Amino acid sequence: MSQLHEHYKKTVVEELVKSGKYTNRMQVPRVEKVVLNMGVNSKHEKDVITEAQQELATISGQRPIIRHAKKSIANFHVREGMPVGVKVTLRGQRMFDFLERFFNAALPRIRDFRGVNPRGFDGRGSYTMGVRDQAIFPEVELDKIKHNLGMDVTIVTSANTDAEAKELLKLLGMPFSS
């Protein structure tokens, strides 16, 4: 069990129950899954998709799936069935391991980092943020990066409101800017 998972079970749940918002430990919101997505413009180079797949596998510890376009969009030069990105969904132990590395190792490596934007919530308790450079993750070898792809990180919680989700993520160690 990762340190973040233990911290959640022992400290975060107790603090949220003591705050008076929840009467039962099972009512406390929890992180359900983390979705990592890399959108890739692979029109010109075919190896960009495989490179993105390898980097996302290195970062997440799980093999990502290739996402294909559902419809053709002429303005974007996208045809139906073309690979447009890679995605991986983390749950359970891998999710907590990733979040621990993300909060403690990756986010502080962002240049001029002052905390994550608190406006990234969707109204239903999920938080999404974009990462412009995959080199912030310690697992990625800098000399092997050919393309700076970036990614979207979505943290899905069981919270009903954004305030509950923000409180949960703040107690887990996510550094929000003020």
What are these regions (language model features)?
Residues 1-178:
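Ribosome-associated RNA-binding proteins
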